[in-house]
Swiss-Prot record:
<dbReference type="GO" id="GO:0033273">
    <property type="term" value="P:response to vitamin"/>
</dbReference>
<keyword id="KW-0808">Transferase</keyword>
<feature type="transmembrane region" description="Helical">
    <location>
        <begin position="158"/>
        <end position="178"/>
    </location>
</feature>
<comment type="function">
    <text>Catalyzes the three sequential steps of the methylation pathway for the biosynthesis of phosphatidylcholine, a critical and essential component for membrane structure.</text>
</comment>
<feature type="intramembrane region" description="Helical">
    <location>
        <begin position="13"/>
        <end position="33"/>
    </location>
</feature>
<feature type="topological domain" description="Cytoplasmic">
    <location>
        <begin position="179"/>
        <end position="199"/>
    </location>
</feature>
<feature type="transmembrane region" description="Helical">
    <location>
        <begin position="46"/>
        <end position="66"/>
    </location>
</feature>
<comment type="similarity">
    <text>Belongs to the class VI-like SAM-binding methyltransferase superfamily. PEMT/PEM2 methyltransferase family.</text>
</comment>
<dbReference type="GO" id="GO:0008429">
    <property type="term" value="F:phosphatidylethanolamine binding"/>
</dbReference>
<keyword id="KW-0443">Lipid metabolism</keyword>
<dbReference type="GO" id="GO:0031526">
    <property type="term" value="C:brush border membrane"/>
</dbReference>
<feature type="topological domain" description="Lumenal">
    <location>
        <begin position="2"/>
        <end position="12"/>
    </location>
</feature>
<keyword id="KW-1133">Transmembrane helix</keyword>
<comment type="pathway">
    <text>Phospholipid metabolism; phosphatidylcholine biosynthesis.</text>
</comment>
<keyword id="KW-0949">S-adenosyl-L-methionine</keyword>
<dbReference type="GO" id="GO:0042383">
    <property type="term" value="C:sarcolemma"/>
</dbReference>
<feature type="transmembrane region" description="Helical">
    <location>
        <begin position="94"/>
        <end position="114"/>
    </location>
</feature>
């Protein structure tokens, strides 16, 4: 990891912006979703849990676009690494980008908009937890697909800065999952218990 730091200026404004957006995004959506789950204030303000979820999801999408823009700007503002600047590495990056897109898009298809964007915090639950592809081959495929996208993008640009930021993306997702996974497991456990009692 230390060899990357020789190529990265952590004080460069676009790098700082990328770090801030990478850290802020999951923090924002987890704080807002937990607040909604406890208070239902967004659902009341919008008059519907669905409208509230769609609104939060739209904000998350815009924040993710901003994060990707800042990530790209940070890479472009810092030097490439000669050892990564080859056709082999470029096509490896392209393959990772493609793999990541498959997992992100198939996750979205399996979950739908509300399933992707924290609908369970709004009381919008599916019949049961999704276990079809890509969830049948990988836990949290949306997050790991997104991480693969950033890794692929960094390799395609031969960017040590991109690699370092990708590590940060992965770490932030791991921390987010420490909060999200227990909640999701518990909420579907409660639903299963309620259904069992009714039957």
């Amino acid at each position: 990891m230390s060899w990357l730091l020789g190529y990265v200026d952590p004080t460069e404004p676009s790098f700082v912006a990328a770090v801030l957006t990478i850290v802020f995004n999951p923090l924002f959506w987890n704080v807002v979703a937990r607040w909604e789950q406890r208070t239902r204030k967004l659902s009341r303000a919008f008059g519907s849990p669905y409208l509230a979820c769609y609104s939060l999801g739209s904000i998350i999408l815009l924040l993710n676009i901003l994060r990707s823009h800042c990530f790209t700007q940070a890479m472009m503002s810092q030097p490439k690494m000669e050892g990564l600047d080859s056709h082999t590495i470029y096509f490896l990056g392209l393959a990772l980008l493609g793999w990541g897109l498959v997992f992100v898009l198939s996750s979205f298809y399996a979950l739908g908009f509300t399933g992707t964007f924290l609908g369970d915090y709004f009381g919008i639950l599916k019949e049961s937890r999704v276990t079809t592809f890509p969830f049948s081959v990988l836990d949290n495929p949306m997050y790991w697909g997104s991480t693969a996208n950033y890794l692929g993008w960094a390799l395609m640009h031969a960017s040590p800065t991109g690699l370092l930021l990708t590590v940060l993306v992965a770490l932030v997702y791991v921390v987010a999952l420490l909060f999200e996974e227990p909640f999701t497991a518990e909420i579907y456990r409660r639903k299963a218990t309620r259904l069992h009692k009714r039957s």
